[in-house]
Amino acid sequence: MPLADARRRPRGHRPHARSVPLLAAACALALALAGCAVGGGGAPEAPSRGDGAADIPDFSENRLQPLEGTGEPELPVTVDSVVLDPYRTSSDPLGYEQVEVDDVSRILPLTGSLAEIVFTLGLGDNVVGRDVAATFEEASGLPVISEGHEVSAESVLALEPTVILADTQTGPSEAVEQIQRSGVPVVIVEEAWSIDEMYPRFERVAEALGVPDDGAALSERTRAQMAEVREEADGSGDGPLVAFLYLRGTAGVYLLGGEGSGADAVLAETGARDAGVEMGLTTPFTPITTEALIAAQPDVLLVMTQGLESVGGVDGLVEIPGVAQTPAGAARAVVDFEDGVLLNFGPRTPQVVAALADELAAFQAEGEGR
């Protein structure tokens, strides 16, 4: 797994159920996001088209919250699409080309996050296939045609899409080029690595599908939901010290998240501190060493569910050298999130942040009670 490119991160592959404590935290989340401001007329009104916080699904239901009042696509549109360059490094600027989209009757998003955006924009009925990371209920009946950004051109073209959505990690490049040569419009958008970067992504997807106003409305609604989450979360930065571990035990992959992992942005929203960032790790992922893990002394370990299962659950995790010698390992303080959700930076990110904040607060209260 290459670590040289500081803008690449590992991705999860298959959906798994979250732990029971996290689901309980998610139930509290729905109430937090649905709550209205208390007090007199000083609270701003929610945006009319971006409204709908009261209808947010319980996170444990694994459903999306579609926008209300979405419009019909206005086509054709000509949009910018990233040019995939296998030789580009993280410091090189992206190149763009123009792509015309004139039919969105058969949409094929090649990542879970892009699928979430399309469904939330009200165009889910037009989607003909999904990436394995599109684990939400509305997409469950669709055929899986890509896994962890690895696509098969034959599988994609067999679905006869009229437009394909991808991002800068979609590959292999040979497959993408084969799809592009077929004549099907392929719109490639930038990845989102932080909260702020996800809003332009919403709008880029909406523009490509001929519904730019709905993209703006989705950004507006998600910003409002994030503001509510921040009010509920402890944003002081004095929260627990959390180490994000990317684990694939069957492949011998054990990585510690640092700056740019995506988890650092989510943790910052909860008020927690990222152990890798505090250690000075300036790349998204670094191989775990016993000494570094012990020196980090995290209070909580954050992992993806499939990764946790790949090392034998919590029992296997604490057997990894150095883990048991940390406060998190000694207390078995482990939070696991479904692979296709934690780092998606999509319409459900406010739910992710709120659920994680609740879970970390529970661990912190438990630790202070000892």
Report each predicted region and the residues it spans:
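Bacterial Sec-exported substrate-binding components of ABC uptake systems
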Residues: 2-27, 34-110, 213-243, 361-370
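A short, structured surface patch at a secondary-structure boundary
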Residues: 68-88, 105-159, 163-168, 275
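Extracytoplasmic/secreted envelope proteins and their assembly/folding machinery
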Residues: 76, 101-104, 111-118, 124-125, ...
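Short, solvent-exposed loop/turn elements at domain surfaces
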Residues: 86-89, 97-98, 115-120, 135-139, ...
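Proline-aspartate-enriched helix->loop->beta-strand connector
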Residues: 104, 152-169, 184, 289-303
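Extracytoplasmic ligand-binding site segments that recognize negatively charged/polar headgroups
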Residues: 172-174, 187-204, 237-265, 309-312
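Structured C-terminal subdomain patch of bacterial secreted/periplasmic proteins
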Residues: 197, 203-207, 300-370
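His/Asp/Glu-enriched short active-site or ligand-binding loop at hydrolase and phosphoryl-transfer sites
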Residues: 257-284
